[in-house]
Amino acid sequence: FGNASMYGGFCLAYVAYVSLKNKITDINQLKEYVELTFSPERVSFIKENIGNLWNVAIEISEEYSEAALLATVLWWQLQGNRFMGECETPQSVIKLANEILQISNDKVADFCSGIGSFLVSAIEKSPESQFYGTEIVRDVKEVSAIRTELISDRVKIEQKSVLNIKDNLMFDKIFCDYPWGIKAKDSIGSNEALQAIYDEIPEVQKVAAGDWIFIINVMNHLNKHGKAVVSVSNGVTWNGGINTVIREKFVKKGFVEAVIALPSNLYSNTGIAC
């Protein structure tokens, strides 16, 4: 699936799947189907990444089975930048999160859902649950929406900052693999979201890194008896100063059930442990 675009291979596989699924063998008919069927955002995403390779998509649809193309779309891997939020969560972390969360007929969220790898896995384990994802990057959001829509009609993916989710949107289970290295001042969404976090633990105002803002935001959207898994850099667990005070408050409030140390080099684009 050669293409200069980061998402070119994914789009070729997806359009090839659409072509085969709907028995479309003409380039113009395929373009028309895409434009009439999908949202303007989806159409733009496909056109920008597939370029002039519509004929290649049709050729691929004639070469591979529907099952093979579906598998390619569902398990496509993104090689991105961990610190820009464009790095796929490792399958080992996803498997661990699913084991901890034990999703079963729950309302489930993936904050900073990326290309939807956790949601795809969670849907397979508990198709009767309801799923929600939020991702700020348009192209990444489209990838996750495409993948999850193919296997469930009980999922909603929104393009927005995870810190701008409605206050009354609550979940039974939350997974969050947020982008590391973001400063607190750069990670804030609305002023209301900022104030809610500061009201919960005021010391967060004095921390430069944005980690605690993402973590507390998860807690703000968790039901009373809910459970969350948040992937953090290991510095969150041992940084001194005001971070020590914040950790103590988390423990005293009963927010922490366990801390699991994971090895370095789990993520493809950083050797930092989590």
Name each model feature, range by range:
Residues 80-183, 233-234, 246, 252-253:
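Conserved S-adenosyl-L-methionine
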Residues 156, 195-196, 227-232:
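Short acidic (Asp/Glu) and glycine-rich catalytic loops that position anionic groups and cofactors
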Residues 10, 135, 211:
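Acidic-residue sensor for enzyme active/binding pockets
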Residues 172, 271-274:
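Short, surface-exposed amphipathic charged segments that create phosphate/polyanion-binding patches used
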Residues 178-213, 235:
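Mobile active-site "lid"/loop adjacent to the S-adenosyl-L-methionine
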Residues 206-272:
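Conserved Class I SAM-dependent methyltransferase catalytic core
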Residues 1-82:
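Long recognition/docking surfaces used for binding and targeting
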Residues 5-7, 88-92, 205-212:
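Short, conserved micro-motifs enriched in small and acidic residues
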